[in-house]
Amino acid sequence: MVGCWVALALVLPMAVPSLAEMAQRHPVAVLPADAPSSVAVRQMAEAFHESGSENILVVLLTDEKGLGAADENVYHTLVDRLRNDAKDVVMLQDFLTTPPLREVLGSKDGKAWILPIGLAGDLGTPKSYHAYTDVERIVKRTVAGTTLTANVTGPAATVADLTDAGARDRASIELAIAVMLLVILMVIYRNPVTMLLPLVTIGASLMTAQALVAGVSLVGGLAVSNQAIVLLSAMIAGAGTDYAVFLISRYHEYVRLGEHPERAVQRAMMSVGKVIAASAATVGITFLGMRFAKLGVFSTVGPALAIGIAVSFLAAVTLLPAILVLASPRGWVAPRGERMATFWRRAGTRIVRRPKAYLGASLIGLVALASCASLAHFNYDDRKQLPPSDPSSVGYAAMEHHFSVNQTIPEYLIIHSAHDLRTPRGLADLEQLAQRVSQIPGVAMVRGVTRPNGETLEQARATYQAGQVGNRLGGASRMIDERTGDLNRLASGANLLADNLGDVRGQVSRAVAGVRSLVDALAYIQNQFGGNKTFNEIDNAARLVSNIHALGDALQVNFDGIANSFDWLDSVVAALDTSPVCDSNPMCGNARVQFHKLQTARDNGTLDKVVGLARQLQSTRSPQTVSAVVNDLGRSLNSVVRSLKSLGLDNPDAARARLISMQNGANDLASAGRQVADGVQMLVDQTKNMGIGLNQASAFLMAMGNDASQPSMAGFNVPPQVLKSEEFKKVAQAFISPDGHTVRYFIQTDLNPFSTAAMDQVNTIIDTAKGAQPNTSLADASISMSGYPVMLRDIRDYYERDMRLIVAVTVVVVILILMALLRAIVAPLYLVGSVVISYMSAIGLGVVVFQVFLGQELHWSVPGLAFVVLVAVGADYNMLLASRLRDESALGVRSSVIRTVRCTGGVITAAGLIFAASMSGLLFSSIGTVVQGGFIIGVGILIDTFVVRTITVPAMATLLGRASWWPGHPWQRCAPEEGQMSARMSARTKTVFQAVADGSKR
C-alpha cells in the first residue's frame, strides 16, 4: 500500500499539467453567463459591434506640470502603436478618433489622461495575461524619456497582480504551514517519527489531490482559482492532520491498554475509522453541494476541496495504517506519557459538577462575539485585496488624485426596442426616461444622444424652440408696427383706386353710348353706300347731299365727345392689365381687349380720320357738284371703313355686342375694385390686430423660453430633418446602435462604485427607467444596465442566494450524518447549533479585528467559505466527541462525560491546533481576502476547540443526560471493545468517577 501511494504521488503529477497551469487555462468566471450584467454586456457589444470585453486595462498618463503639445504627441504615438497591436488590443477609446471623448478622458486639472484598452482574452486567462504584459511593455517603452508618467491599472491589472501575488505567496504559505505543523506535532508527540507520520500522509495527499484536480480540470473543464489552490493546500493539511491525529491518538490509547501494536492499529481503525469516514463524508458532501452555487468562487472551490478531502480520507485509512503497521514493531511510534490526562479529567469533573454555570458562561461569551457579526460591512472592492505597493494599486491611487473613481468606472443604461428609436417621438421618450434617471439622488450625470454633455440639448428643448419662435413673432410684430403707415396708405390707395374705377365706369358708359350711336350711323352708311353699291346709282343728288350733311353733323357730335373722353383710356388699360380680378373674369377680359383696340385706334389716327370725315360731310353744300362730292366722300369712306375694320366695327352687330361686353366689364371692374378696397381695408385692420396678437404671443413664448428653461419644464423635440443631419449621426454613433434598436446612456454617480450604496442605486435606476416606459414608444423595450457596480450587484445577489444554499446543504448533511452515526435526533441538533454559534462568533471576532481595529471591511467571499470549513471541521470534532460519549454512556451520564473529556480533550485540542495552524499559514499571504479567511477560520477552529467542544457541548450533554440519545438507548448498545476498555480501567480512575458521581448526588 505504501508503494502504491508513493507511485501515485510521483507519477500522477507527471501525467497532467500543474494545477497552476490549469488555473490559467480554465480561470474562474466571476459571474455565470446568465447573470443580468453579463447578458447586458453581450447585448450591448452585439448591438454596437464592439468586442464586449470586460478585460479592461486603463493606462493613466500624467504630467504634473500640465499636459502640453509634446505630451499630446507622445499620446498620439502610443495610440498608433496600440492600434497596430491587433493581437493584444481589441478595443481602444481615445480622443484622437473620437474628439468628444477628450472632456471625459482628460482630468479637470489638465494634468492627466486616461486611455481605456480592451485586451484580448477573457479576464484571468493566459491570453489575457500575455496581452497585459505586452501592452504594459508598449506603454513603458513609449513614455520612456518623456515628460509623461504612465501607470497601468483597471480590472486586467488587478487580476494580473492577484495572479502574481498568488504565485508569489504559495511557497511562503506552504512553508509556514509546514513549520507550524512540525512545531505543534513535536510538542504533542515528542517523537520525531510520530511527528512525521501526519506530514507524510499530508504530502502524499497534497501531491495526489493537486494532480487529480488538475486532471479533472483538463478533462472535465473544471475552473480553478487561486483561492482554490491555496485553500486546497490548507484543507488537506488541516483535515489530513486531523484524521492522522484521531487515528494515532486512538492507537496510542490501545497500546497503553496493553494491546499488541498491530492489533492496536486494527482496533483503532475499527473504533475511530467510522468517525473519520463520517467526518470526511460530511465535509466532502458539503463541498460537493457548493457545485450548485452560482458564483464561481464557490462552485469551483467546492469540487476541488471535495477531491482533496476524499484523497485525505483515503490516505488516512490506507497509507497511515500501513505506515503504523510497519513502524510500530520497531517502537518508532510508541506513545509517550499522558501529561494532560489529569488536566482534562479535572476539567470534565468541574463541568459535570456545575454544568449550568459553564454552559451559561460559554454561551454568553459566544453570543457576545456572535452579536458583533451584525456590525459587518462587506467589501466588494477587489483593489483592496492587494498591497498598496502593487502596480495596479499605485495606478488607482494616482488616478484618484486626478479623477473621481466613478468617472473611470462607468455604468451604462441600455434600452433595447423592437423598433427603430431614431424618431422624434422615440427621442422625446428617451429624454424623458433619461431626465427621470438624472433626478435620482446620487446620480451626477447622464450622457446620451439626447444629452451629449449631460444636459438636455438646448436646441431640442421645446421651450428653447418656443423662445426662438417668439423672437421671430416679435420681429414680425415689430415689422407690422413699423409698417402701419404703409398699411394705411395701402388702404387709402385701394379706396382711391375703387373711386377712380367708379369714375371710369361712368366715362365708359358715356363713351359706349356715343360709340353705339357711331356704330348705328356707320351701319347706316354701310347699308346705304357700302357693298356693291356705287355713287353712280344715286339719282337723287339733293337727297344725298341732305343726308350726307346730316350724317356729318351726327359724326361731329359723337366723335367730338368720344375724342374728348379718351384721356382716361391709358390709366384704365394699365389697371386692367395688372388686375387679377380681370384675369379671372371673362367679361372683363373681353372689355380689356376692346379698350386695347380703342387705344390703338386713337394712337394710329383712326378716330381722327372719322372726325375728319364728319367735318367733310358737314361741309357738303348744294353749290358743290355731285361729282366732286361723291369723289371726295368715296375716298374718305374707303379710308374710314378700312380703319373701322381694324376696330372691329365693320360688323355692326358684333360691335354692338362688344360694346355691351365692354360696358359690363367696366361695371364688373368697378364693383371688383370696390370689393378689393373693402378687402384691403379689412386686411389692414386684421393685420394691425394680428400685430397686437403676435406681440402678446411673442411675449408669452419668450417668457416660456427664459423662465421655463429648467429640464423638468423644457420639454423635448427633435425635428425629423435634424435626424438626417451629419452632426446628429456623428453624435448618435456613440449612443445609438447602427440599426437604431438599441440606445445606451452613460451614467456617472457621486457614489463609490464599489460600495453597497452604488449596488442599491443600480436597482433604483432600473426601476426608475422602467417607470418611464408606460404609454410611450418605449413600452415594449427591455431595460438593463452594465458596469462594475452592476456586476457587484449581481455578485451580492448571487452570494445571498448561494449562502442560503450552502447553509441549507451543510446543515442538512451534518445533521443527517450525525443522526446516522449517533442513531439519535436530539444530540445532532444541539451539536449543529453549537457549530453555527461557533461560526458566528468567529465572524464577530473577525469584524472586531479587521473592521473595528484595522479599518478593513470583510471581503464578501470570506463568510461563505468560512461557514463551510468551520461547520464541516466542527462536525469532525462533534463526531469524535459525540461518538465517544455514546460509547462511554454505559458508565452513566456524568461519568461518560468525564471519561470522554479526558480521552478526547487532548486529541481535539491537538487536532484543533493543527488545523488552526494550517489556516494561520494563510496569514502570510499578501492577498487581503486570503488573510481574512485564514484568520477567521483559524480563530473559529480555536473557539470550537477550546470553548465549544471543551465546555459548551459537555455541559449541554450533562444537562440533557440520556435525552441526548433520544429515541435510541445507546447505553444498552455499547461497543464491545469500549466495554473491554471500561473493564480495564484502573481502580483509581473508578474511585474518582464514583466520587464525582456521589458528589453530584449530594
From Swiss-Prot:
Compartment list: Cell inner membrane
GO biological process, one term: lipid transport
SUPFAM superfamilies in UniProt: Multidrug efflux transporter AcrB transmembrane domain
Annotated transmembrane regions: 1-21, 177-197, 199-219, 228-248, 268-288, 306-326, 358-378, 806-826, 835-855, 862-882, 901-921, 923-943
Main subcellular localisation: membrane
Membrane topology: Multi-pass membrane protein
Phenotype caused by lack of the gene: Deletion mutant accumulates important amounts of DAT and is devoid of PAT. DAT only accumulates inside the cells and is not exported to the cell surface.
Entries under InterPro entries matching the protein: MMPL_dom, MmpL_fam, Mycobact_MmpL
GO CC terms: cytosol; extracellular region; peptidoglycan-based cell wall; plasma membrane
Source organism superkingdom: Bacteria
Keywords: Cell inner membrane, Cell membrane, Lipid transport, Membrane, Transmembrane, Transmembrane helix, Transport
Pfam families, sorted: MMPL
Family: Belongs to the resistance-nodulation-cell division (RND) (TC 2.A.6) family. MmpL subfamily.
NCBIfam families on file: actII
Protein name: Acyltrehalose exporter MmpL10
Organism: Mycobacterium tuberculosis (strain ATCC 25618 / H37Rv)
Lineage: Bacteria, Bacillati, Actinomycetota, Actinomycetes, Mycobacteriales
